[in-house]
Amino acid sequence: YPVKPENPGEDAPTEELAKYYTALRHYINLITRQRY
């Protein structure tokens, strides 16, 4: 099962947040694809 990306926190640099949200979207896609 895919591991949920770590939240970098409010004061993380923009690149880190962008990377996190991309990983999170990918993670959600993986989970929903497996479920349905």
UniProtKB/Swiss-Prot annotation:
One MF term in the entry's GO annotations: neuropeptide hormone activity
Function, in words: NPY is implicated in the control of feeding and in secretion of gonadotrophin-release hormone.
Keyword Secreted: yes
GO biological process, any: neuropeptide signaling pathway
Entry annotated with the keyword Metal-binding: no
Alphabetical list of Pfam families matching this protein: Hormone_3
Example of a GO cellular component annotation carried by this entry: extracellular space
Name of encoding gene: npy
Family to which this protein belongs: Belongs to the NPY family.
Protein name per its UniProtKB record: Neuropeptide Y
Matches recorded under InterPro entries: Pancreatic_hormone-like, Pancreatic_hormone-like_CS
Modification sites for Tyrosine amide: 36
UniProt keyword list: Amidation, Neuropeptide, Secreted
Localization terms from the record: Secreted
Main location: secreted
Superkingdom of the source species: Eukaryota
